[in-house]
Amino acid sequence: MKFIILTCLLAVALAKQESKDNSQEDFKQTVDVVIFPGQETVKNIPIPQMESVEAPIKNKCYQSIQTFKPPQALKGLYQYHMAKNPWGYTVNRAFPSTRTLQYNQKTMDLSMRAREKIVMSEIKKNIQDYVTKMKQYSKITWPRFVKSLQQYQKTMNPWSCYPYTLLQV
């Protein structure tokens, strides 16, 4: 072990001495050369560092992505609005809930509006009673496989539908 350490130290010492000798020879060669200064001034010309060709292209791509701003209508197009259901499964809604609608960068809070007394006709009262009765049926717990089916609903937009023609009979 001592022998290995000794040889390593000896090799390093010889390498340093050899590099000193080389640098002294270079210095002796440059001392013999005489340079007469000219009338023009010497300017420091910066040498550009070597850069890969791909770097500017990547920078341009990233800059264009960062500066691209999609229209306001397209921002929420593919966002799935998740609502946690109290019965233990998640429902994807096709449209945002009313509290998340935005108009001119300001959120609309529907609870801030003044409540007005609404006069309803008999038909509207019957419809409202029917809706409240149907809410009772929505509280029925479904089996686990039905819960998982409702999680993967896709929102519909005009670009995801296939055009079809009606058959004339």
UniProtKB/Swiss-Prot annotation:
GO terms for molecular function: protein homodimerization activity; zymogen binding. It is found in: Secreted. Its main location: secreted. One of its GO terms (cellular component) is extracellular space. It holds the Pfam family Casein. It comes from the Eukaryota. Important role in the capacity of milk to transport calcium phosphate. Belongs to the alpha-casein family. This is Alpha-S2-casein-like B. The lineage of its organism: Eukaryota, Metazoa, Chordata, Craniata, Vertebrata.
